[in-house]
Amino acid sequence: MFVPIGSEQDFPSDYTLLLPAISVGNVGQLAIDLIISTLKIPKVGYFYTDCLVPMVGSNPYETDEENAKELCTNAEVYALPSQKLAVLQLRSLVIKKKSKSFRQALVSWIKRCAFARVILLSSCHAYHRDDTQLFGTPFRYLVTPALQKSVADVLKELEWKEMEKVSSYPGLNDNEKRVFIPGGGFTKRFYDDCCLEDLQMAVVLKFCSEGDNVPDAFSLLNQVNEWLHLVASTNGDVLAKWKAPGSWQLLFGSGLPAAIF
């Protein structure tokens, strides 16, 4: 599944893997773009899979003509040895009938690389919140039992809120509860897979709605940065530290031509 660009096939076992869910507003994918662009993480390989919608484009992180000619595909892997960080960026949808196959291949690769921890950036429909979720922070997290012990104190100190469980049958049986992440794509099932495989994995997500989700990506990344310290903040202001890719200038298309006025 993973095809390296160079001779390196795997990663050292102390690396952290960051990846996005393909979820509402593409918040996780936008946040991953910011990480790659800000830290200038070089590409080390890509995923060869038939589980994603085929896609190819120009390099989204380069603005000069020469480097922008480099092609990007639907699933690429980046690595930054100085921070022991690996990043997987997904740029197209998972084919519905192949979602399970994709998750299995992803889990298999994670196990082979023996990543120290895996962090999935995701989002969830804001309109599905219950009354208790309408107040306070819009961020939630989930951690697998394998990771719980090592991060429990840190997350408690950060005052993060765990994703609440909701009734499986509202109004009929409130005793049976489950984790429900509407609009989260493969988030819930991938989390369940990691629990079954005893992987050290965490989900960090934000409640949001479809629209201009760039601010959601910035805020989600700031939340993650409190834990991982990817970039240093100055006087508590970390927003200015994130660098948006040049390709974001065309996020909503080119400007209106003056001739129409």
Curated annotation (Swiss-Prot):
Belongs to the PSMG2 family. Degraded by the proteasome upon completion of 20S proteasome maturation. InterPro entries: Proteasome_assmbl_chaperone_2, Proteasome_assmbl_chp_2_euk, PSMG2_sf. GO terms for cellular component: nucleus. It is found in: Nucleus. PANTHER family: PROTEASOME ASSEMBLY CHAPERONE 2. Chaperone protein which promotes assembly of the 20S proteasome as part of a heterodimer with psmg1. This is Proteasome assembly chaperone 2. Keywords: Chaperone, Nucleus. One of its GO terms (biological process) is chaperone-mediated protein complex assembly. Forms a heterodimer with psmg1. It comes from the Eukaryota. It comes from Xenopus tropicalis (Western clawed frog).
